[in-house]
């Protein structure tokens, strides 16, 4: 563990560690946060989505027209072993900034930005007064209608919400009926959704904050249909909408967490068979350098994808057909596009 942590730091807390079954070496919660020697096996890169290409100012990314992304901290309540921004915790150049005034001005000048994502790091790791300061500045920009806050603290440390009534009050103040705050939660396994987490989510809901959930498919954590079914159902039961299911990005140290893309798709499809419509609203996407690419279907010979979101607006909605590649783990592994695909006709009479 120490050898791995020297390269990829470890961070957690007593609450989250208490969720681990220490007698089980394959415990999924353990895999999420405890260093694994396989992280040193090589492969992957520090910036798999080429975020540097969309960085307009230190701490500000503008990849999609409508969305501005603020890196407000490089601290998390725990460090996920599969984090796609491991570079923030390594000996790399600092990307998050404390002074966001220039970034706020950029957002003010770009009226196409209708929503801003506060992330990092974990946005709720900021001091409550600092959170309020940023929210206040963003709410003074007329064209910013949605503020999103990326956070795994509902899983890592729900007491951050329950033990700080001022935080809940601040969020309530700036999440209005016309302009909501969305909390982008990160429950990866159903056991993370404890009674305490549900109470914290309820406090946010009562404050007018809309909570949604996103998770990657993680080998050995949630890479089976039964686990995903339970996760999708339980978050929806708690009033948390499934939002995205991500293909695990090819970040440095992440290789053993990845499942093949087509296997991920099949796991999700199987998991949905026992879910209501409300529990299966998530889209399965790859957060590629060029945009969010959704896998929408497959046959024995082909896979079907579309750009759900794209850095180049002309690509939004673009439909793509590729020859099946059962070992592909990322979009770049699909090299055989089918330009003349014609659906097979089936006569019903």
Describe each region flagged by the PLM:
Residues 1-63:
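Flexible, acidic/Gly-rich N-terminal and inter-domain linker regions that tether
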């Amino acid at each position: 563990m120490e050898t791995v942590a020297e390269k990829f730091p470890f961070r957690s807390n007593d609450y989250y560690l208490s969720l681990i079954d220490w007698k089980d070496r394959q415990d999924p919660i353990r895999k999420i946060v405890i260093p694994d020697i396989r992280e040193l096996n090589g492969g992957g890169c520090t910036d798999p989505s080429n975020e540097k290409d969309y960085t307009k100012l230190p701490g500000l990314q503008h990849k999609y027209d409508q969305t501005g992304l603020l890196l407000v901290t490089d601290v998390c309540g725990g460090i996920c072993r599969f984090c796609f921004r491991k570079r923030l915790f390594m000996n790399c150049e600092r990307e998050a900034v404390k002074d966001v005034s220039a970034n706020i001005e950029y957002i003010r000048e770009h009226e196409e930005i209708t929503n801003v994502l506060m992330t990092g790091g974990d946005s709720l790791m900021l001091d409550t007064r600092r959170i309020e300061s940023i929210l206040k500045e963003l709410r003074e920009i007329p064209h910013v209608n949605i503020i999103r806050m990326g956070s795994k603290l509902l899983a890592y440390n729900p007491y951050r919400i329950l033990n700080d009534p001022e935080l809940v009050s601040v969020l309530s103040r700036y999440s209005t009926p016309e302009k909501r705050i969305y909390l982008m939660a990160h429950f990866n396994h159903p056991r993370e959704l404890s009674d305490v987490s549900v109470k914290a989510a309820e406090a946010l809901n009562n404050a007018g904050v809309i909570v949604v959930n996103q998770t990657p498919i993680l080998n050995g954590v949630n890479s089976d249909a039964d686990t995903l079914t339970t996760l999708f159902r339980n978050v929806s039961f708690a009033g948390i909408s499934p939002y995205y299911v991500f293909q695990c990005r090819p970040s440095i140290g992440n290789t053993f967490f990845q499942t093949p893309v087509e296997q991920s798709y099949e796991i999700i499809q199987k998991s949905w068979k026992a879910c209501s419509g409300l529990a299966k609203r998530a889209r399965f996407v790859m957060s590629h350098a060029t945009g969010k690419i959704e896998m929408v279907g497959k046959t024995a010979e082909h896979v079907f994808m579309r750009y759900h979101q794209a850095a180049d607006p002309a690509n939004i909605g673009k439909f793509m057909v590729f020859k099946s590649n059962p070992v592909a783990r990322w979009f770049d592994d699909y090299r055989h596009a089918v330009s003349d695909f014609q659906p097979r006709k089936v006569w019903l009479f």
